[in-house]
């Protein structure tokens, strides 16, 4: 199915509960395909791997208004490049990473938008800080002037019943954080992927990350 049809299907499905941001999860998607996605109106692209993302940014540098999000695991030695080349980093999970991003962002015009990744499902295969660590990490980030904390991100459990509980807990955590004066301007709850984005929207997600449902199954060889 062409990308235009896939996108139209998604837009129809979310019409009653549109998110603030439809993030195209573009891991292993070619720059030329992203150029086509841009022509269809998509502006936010989420990348998992630094070098792959940098290559695409170079190939698409003629396009105005593209917003690059990093959504993968963060390696300490990559923080400087992430801070310089991305508009958002959505997988901050500990103070050290936040501090390194802050230091590397110094001198740039705008602060780096960041989300705290929360290990809400308890699965070892997924990154993120423990839910009980979120308030302390959020406070630490709020003190770093070159970062702007926008909210929380999570990947929920793949089983529907557990996913529902995870979505609910994430919404509760987000709204509780938002009630504190220092975090009153938080505006982003990023959760929901191709398999569960409608369920996520029912639980107040403001950003959904869609890959397979837009681009089909991908492998690294697709590039």
For the regions a language model picked out, list residue spans one by one.
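Gly/Pro- and small hydrophobic-enriched strand-loop and loop-to-helix capping segments
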Residues: 205-223
């Amino acid at each position: 199915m062409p990308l235009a049809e896939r996108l139209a299907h998604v837009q129809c499905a979310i019409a009653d509960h549109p998110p603030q941001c439809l993030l195209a999860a573009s891991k292993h998607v070619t720059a030329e395909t992203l150029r086509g996605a841009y022509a269809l109106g998509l502006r936010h692209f989420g990348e998992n791997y630094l070098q792959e993302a940098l290559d695409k940014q170079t190939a698409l540098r003629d396009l105005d208004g593209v917003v690059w999000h990093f959504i993968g695991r963060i390696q300490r030695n990559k923080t400087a490049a992430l801070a310089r080349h991305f508009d958002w980093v959505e997988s901050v999970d500990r103070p050290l990473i936040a501090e390194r991003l802050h230091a590397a962002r110094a001198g740039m015009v705008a602060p780096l938008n960041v989300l705290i990744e929360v290990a809400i499902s308890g699965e070892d295969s997924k990154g993120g800080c423990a839910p009980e660590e979120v308030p302390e990490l959020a406070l630490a980030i709020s003190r770093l002037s070159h970062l702007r904390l926008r909210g929380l991100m999570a990947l929920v459990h793949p089983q529907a019943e557990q996913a529902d509980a995870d979505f609910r807990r994430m919404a509760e955590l987000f709204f509780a954080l938002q009630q504190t004066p220092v975090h009153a301007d938080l505006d982003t709850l990023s959760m929901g992927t191709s398999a569960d984005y409608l369920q996520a929207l029912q639980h107040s997600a403001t950003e959904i990350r869609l890959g397979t449902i837009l681009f089909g199954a991908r492998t690294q060889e697709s590039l």
